[in-house]
């Protein structure tokens, strides 16, 4: 059995050592044939609090770590482009 890996976008990092990742999946509607985007949210264990909102990260499935956490952070594929006042010079 292979380990499942997903690529998703961090939408919340307000919890300690946990981030919420949204993964979009495009499927065809069974009756109408229209392509619909479905999203699913996963709670992901981030032991060092590396992830920030807007990061594109790779996660993989693991044993249950809590009631809702079954995914582990693997690596950051793309950092978010958050601009704060120090970087823009205000």
Curated annotation (Swiss-Prot):
Quaternary structure and interacting proteins, as annotated: Part of the 30S ribosomal subunit.
Localisation per UniProt entry: Plastid, Chloroplast
NCBIfam families membership: PRK05610.1 (NF004123), uS17_bact (TIGR03635)
Gene3D superfamilies the UniProt entry points to: Nucleic acid-binding proteins (2.40.50.140)
Family, as annotated: Belongs to the universal ribosomal protein uS17 family.
GO molecular function: rRNA binding; structural constituent of ribosome
GO cellular component, one term: cytosolic small ribosomal subunit
Domain of life: Eukaryota
One Pfam family recorded for the sequence: Ribosomal_S17
Protein name per Swiss-Prot or TrEMBL: Small ribosomal subunit protein uS17c
Single Gene Ontology BP annotation: translation
PROSITE patterns assigned: RIBOSOMAL_S17 (PS00056)
Keywords per UniProt: Chloroplast, Plastid, Ribonucleoprotein, Ribosomal protein, RNA-binding, rRNA-binding
Role noted for this protein: One of the primary rRNA binding proteins, it binds specifically to the 5'-end of 16S ribosomal RNA.
Gene source species: Guillardia theta
